[in-house]
Amino acid sequence: MPQLDTSTWLTMILSMFLVLFIIFQLKISKHNFYHNPELMTTKTPKQNTPWETKWTKIYLPLSLPL
């Protein structure tokens, strides 16, 4: 059974990483990014709920006299 020659693997792996890095750099360089991003304030509409318009009194069990 012949021996597997792995002497060129390091060169192939390093060249692959280099090519991938260059490809990603070229892809990223073509993107248009905003120069001055600003936060947009989103306003949620206030919804009136029935319990907000009525006055209710809540009695806690611990606050009752003994």
Curated annotation (Swiss-Prot):
Superkingdom in the source lineage = Eukaryota
Q: List, alphabetically, the GO terms of the cellular component aspect.
A: mitochondrial membrane; proton-transporting ATP synthase complex
Instruction: Tell me which residues bear N6-acetyllysine.
Output: 54, 57
- Per the annotation, which location comes first and is thus the protein's main one? mitochondrion
Quaternary structure (record): Component of the ATP synthase complex composed at least of ATP5F1A/subunit alpha, ATP5F1B/subunit beta, ATP5MC1/subunit c (homooctomer), MT-ATP6/subunit a, MT-ATP8/subunit 8, ATP5ME/subunit e, ATP5MF/subunit f, ATP5MG/subunit g, ATP5MK/subunit k, ATP5MJ/subunit j, ATP5F1C/subunit gamma, ATP5F1D/subunit delta, ATP5F1E/subunit epsilon, ATP5PF/subunit F6, ATP5PB/subunit b, ATP5PD/subunit d, ATP5PO/subunit OSCP.
What is the recorded membrane topology of this protein?
A: Single-pass membrane protein
Keywords per UniProt: Acetylation, ATP synthesis, CF(0), Hydrogen ion transport, Ion transport, Membrane, Mitochondrion, Transmembrane, Transmembrane helix, Transport
Q: Where are the transmembrane segments?
A: 8-24
Specify the species.
Ovis aries (Sheep)
**One example of a Gene Ontology biological process annotation:** proton motive force-driven ATP synthesis
Record localization: Mitochondrion membrane
Q: Any idea which residues bear N6-succinyllysine here?
A: 54
Q: Which family does this protein fall into?
A: Belongs to the ATPase protein 8 family.
The entry lists its GO molecular-function terms as: proton transmembrane transporter activity
Pfam families, sorted: ATP-synt_8
Q: Under which name does UniProt file this protein? A: ATP synthase F(0) complex subunit 8
